[in-house]
């Protein structure tokens, strides 16, 4: 899976929602970590 670059966790919400269906995400070391639905 291609890494999603980010400057903050809110940069990840939309791309992670597109990828996993839920916007649960954090920005870690300038890349998004998508957690999917919990």
From Swiss-Prot:
Site (Important for the interaction with Kv1.2/KCNA2 channel): 10, 19, 28, 30, 33
Any one GO molecular-function label of the UniProt entry: potassium channel regulator activity
Superkingdom per UniProt: Eukaryota
Tagged with keyword Cell wall biogenesis/degradation: no
Tissue: Expressed by the venom gland.
Disulphides: 6-27, 12-32, 16-34, 22-37
SUPFAM superfamilies: Scorpion toxin-like
GO annotations of cellular component type: extracellular region
Site label Aromatic residue of the functional dyad, important for the interaction with Kv1.2/KCNA2 channel, positions: 35
InterPro entries noted in UniProt: Scorpion_toxin-like_sf, Scorpion_toxinS_K_inh
Pfam families: Toxin_2
Keyword terms of this UniProt record: Calcium-activated potassium channel impairing toxin, Disulfide bond, Ion channel impairing toxin, Potassium channel impairing toxin, Secreted, Toxin, Voltage-gated potassium channel impairing toxin
Residues the record marks as site: Basic residue of the functional dyad, important for the interaction with Kv1.2/KCNA2 channel: 26
Compartments (UniProt record): Secreted
Family according to the record: Belongs to the short scorpion toxin superfamily. Potassium channel inhibitor family. Alpha-KTx 06 subfamily.
UniProt comment concerning the protein's domains: Has the structural arrangement of an alpha-helix connected to a beta-sheet by disulfide bonds (CSalpha/beta).
Additional information: Negative results: has no effect on voltage-gated potassium channel Kv1.1/KCNA1 and Kv1.3/KCNA3.
Protein task: Potently, completely and reversibly blocks voltage-gated potassium channel Kv1.2/KCNA2 and Shaker B (Sh). Also blocks small conductance (SK) calcium-activated potassium channel (KCNN).
Protein name per UniProt: Potassium channel toxin alpha-KTx 6.4
